[in-house]
């Protein structure tokens, strides 16, 4: 009776008016129905509702990561110079810079995990069946800057993936506790079972990844590939794009592997020892085991599960692992050499035709200061728009268009204290592309 009375009030007893009112009621009912069907907390991947534009819009609005400043991220990602200059000028204004989130902030907000994940806008369900069926493993080695770690985790997070986090034993206790608090909110993120003190350019950097490899192989997740990261990395592809790129490898690995220069050969000519730092001795090392040809690359790799298994279990691999332990920066020649070893799954021959530069491999995009220059004159890339640290570009907003033109899965280095605009725009770009499948 109440419903009938409500209809009479809304729709007076005129036939034409009544027809219009019933049409209005139908539209309202449809919109309410769509709203209920688009419950973003319980979307079914196979449902038509999930694929509808209306639901995508609702989902994006609940998860979008817009830049917090008045910068034109769409223009920056497209290389619009006016937008880039505005962002670079904006970054110079100290008063506009937000202080980084602290260990204490994360210790407090993670007391309520659901609030933390909602407020920090983590994607908590697979965005496609293809992604669900192709889980990726991550080895994440960190030692400082808790907000950097949390934003990196958020950017690469998907509930079907598996994440091992190694924290440097030397890190402050509050940092370690904040990392533990964050990962306690996710069933598929865990701390490495064995932690080591990481010394720059020493074996410990490799050991951190090996510890995560062991743990990841013991997990119940049937991951296909392993990616390793550090705290200054950030993805430049969505999880869906990564899955597609990894499938195209067809079991092969992707990492830099080139012939070493004479200066780099000195890295394994003498033995190195570790105290608080790494220092050379006068002790000459024996040649590589079985006169294996040595190659150089970097610390980062895209490795198949079978490759990882052989790193840990194959006797020939273990002999090489032992041999490189007292060399300088072994992470930059161990993986590169194993990638050319004939017994390793997914490797490539040692013949020069198979040399792989960092620009050819998909593991990591880096701008080296000594390679920057005029592209029209043959330089591989333009000068860094941020600053340099250890001859590596800390990206600025002017680098983002170039970054997004490359095929790599991740890029290095980012630091929000140097330029947060480039990171915010990259976050906005990736989140938009993850939900809509299109660029900003």
From Swiss-Prot:
Lumenal face residues: 31-440
Keyword ATP-binding found: no
Segments passing through the bilayer: 10-30
Catalytic activity entry: a 3-O-[beta-D-galactosyl-(1->3)-N-acetyl-alpha-D-galactosaminyl]-L-seryl-[protein] + UDP-N-acetyl-alpha-D-glucosamine = 3-O-{beta-D-galactosyl-(1->3)-[N-acetyl-beta-D-glucosaminyl-(1->6)]-N-acetyl-alpha-D-galactosaminyl}-L-seryl-[protein] + UDP + H(+); a 3-O-[beta-D-galactosyl-(1->3)-N-acetyl-alpha-D-galactosaminyl]-L-threonyl-[protein] + UDP-N-acetyl-alpha-D-glucosamine = a 3-O-{beta-D-galactosyl-(1->3)-[N-acetyl-beta-D-glucosaminyl-(1->6)]-N-acetyl-alpha-D-galactosaminyl}-L-threonyl-[protein] + UDP + H(+); a beta-D-Gal-(1->4)-beta-D-GlcNAc-(1->3)-beta-D-Gal-(1->4)-beta-D-GlcNAc derivative + UDP-N-acetyl-alpha-D-glucosamine = a beta-D-Gal-(1->4)-beta-D-GlcNAc-(1->3)-[beta-D-GlcNAc-(1->6)]-beta-D-Gal-(1->4)-N-acetyl-beta-D-glucosaminyl derivative + UDP + H(+); 3-O-[N-acetyl-beta-D-glucosaminyl-(1->3)-N-acetyl-alpha-D-galactosaminyl]-L-seryl-[protein] + UDP-N-acetyl-alpha-D-glucosamine = 3-O-[N-acetyl-beta-D-glucosaminyl-(1->3)-[N-acetyl-beta-D-glucosaminyl-(1->6)]-N-acetyl-alpha-D-galactosaminyl]-L-seryl-[protein] + UDP + H(+)
Topology in the lipid bilayer: Single-pass type II membrane protein
InterPro entries: Glyco_trans_14 (IPR003406)
Membrane is among the record's keywords: yes
Glycosylation sites: 72, 108
Origin superkingdom: Viruses
EC number assigned by the record: 2.4.1.102, 2.4.1.148, 2.4.1.150
Molecular function as annotated in GO: acetylgalactosaminyl-O-glycosyl-glycoprotein beta-1,6-N-acetylglucosaminyltransferase activity; beta-1,3-galactosyl-O-glycosyl-glycoprotein beta-1,6-N-acetylglucosaminyltransferase activity; N-acetyllactosaminide beta-1,6-N-acetylglucosaminyltransferase activity
Subcellular location: Host Golgi apparatus membrane
Alphabetical GO biological process terms: protein glycosylation
Short name of any one Pfam family annotated for the protein: Branch
Function: Non-essential glycosyltransferase that can synthesize all known mucin beta 6 N-acetylglucosaminides. Mediates core 2 and core 4 O-glycan branching, 2 important steps in mucin-type biosynthesis. Has also I-branching enzyme activity by converting linear into branched poly-N-acetyllactosaminoglycans. Contributes to the post-translational modifications of structural proteins.
Protein name listed in UniProt: Beta-1,3-galactosyl-O-glycosyl-glycoprotein beta-1,6-N-acetylglucosaminyltransferase
Gene: Bo17
């Amino acid at each position: 009776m109440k419903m009938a009375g409500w209809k009479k009030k809304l729709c007076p007893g005129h036939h034409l008016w009544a027809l219009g009112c019933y049409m209005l009621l139908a539209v309202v009912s449809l919109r309410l129905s769509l709203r209920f069907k688009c419950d973003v907390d319980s979307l079914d991947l196979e449902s038509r509702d999930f694929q509808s534009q209306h639901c995508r819009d609702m989902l994006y609005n609940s998860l979008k990561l817009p830049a917090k400043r008045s910068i034109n991220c769409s223009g920056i990602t497209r290389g619009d110079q006016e937008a880039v200059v505005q962002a670079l000028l904006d970054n110079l204004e100290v008063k506009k810079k937000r202080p980084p989130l602290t260990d204490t902030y994360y210790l407090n907000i993670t007391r309520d995990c659901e609030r933390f994940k909602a407020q920090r806008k983590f994607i908590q369900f697979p965005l496609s069946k293809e992604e669900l069926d192709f889980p990726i493993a991550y080895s994440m080695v960190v030692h400082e800057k808790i907000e950097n770690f949390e934003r990196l985790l958020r950017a690469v997070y998907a509930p079907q993936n598996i994440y091992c986090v190694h924290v440097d034993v030397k890190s402050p206790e509050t940092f370690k506790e904040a990392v533990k608090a964050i990962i306690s909110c996710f069933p598929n993120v865990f701390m490495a079972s064995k932690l080591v003190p990481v010394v720059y350019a020493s074996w410990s950097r490799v050991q951190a990844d090996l510890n995560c490899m062991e743990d990841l192989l013991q997990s119940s997740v049937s991951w296909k590939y392993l990616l390793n990261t550090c705290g200054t990395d950030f993805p430049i592809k969505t999880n869906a794009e990564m899955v597609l790129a990894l499938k195209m490898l067809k079991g092969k690995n992707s990492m830099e592997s080139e012939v070493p220069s004479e200066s780099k050969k000195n890295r394994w000519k003498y033995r190195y020892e570790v105290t608080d730092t790494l220092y050379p001795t006068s002790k000459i090392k024996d040649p590589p085991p079985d006169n294996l040809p040595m190659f150089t690359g970097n610390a980062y790799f895209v490795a198949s599960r079978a490759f990882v298994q052989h790193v840990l279990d194959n006797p020939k691999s273990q002999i090489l692992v032992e041999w490189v332990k007292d060399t300088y920066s072994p992470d930059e020649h161990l993986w590169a050499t194993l990638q050319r070893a004939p017994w390793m799954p997914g490797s490539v021959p040692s013949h020069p035709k198979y040399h792989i530069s960092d620009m050819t491999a998909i593991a990591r995009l880096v701008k080296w200061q000594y390679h920057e220059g005029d592209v029209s004159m043959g330089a591989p890339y333009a000068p860094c728009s941020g600053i340099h640290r250890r001859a590596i570009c800390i990206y600025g907003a002017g680098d983002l268009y170039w970054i997004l033109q490359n095929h790599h899965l991740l890029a290095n280095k980012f630091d929000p204290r140097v330029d947060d605009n480039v990171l915010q725009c990259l976050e906005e770009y990736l989140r938009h592309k993850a939900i809509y499948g299109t660029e900003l």
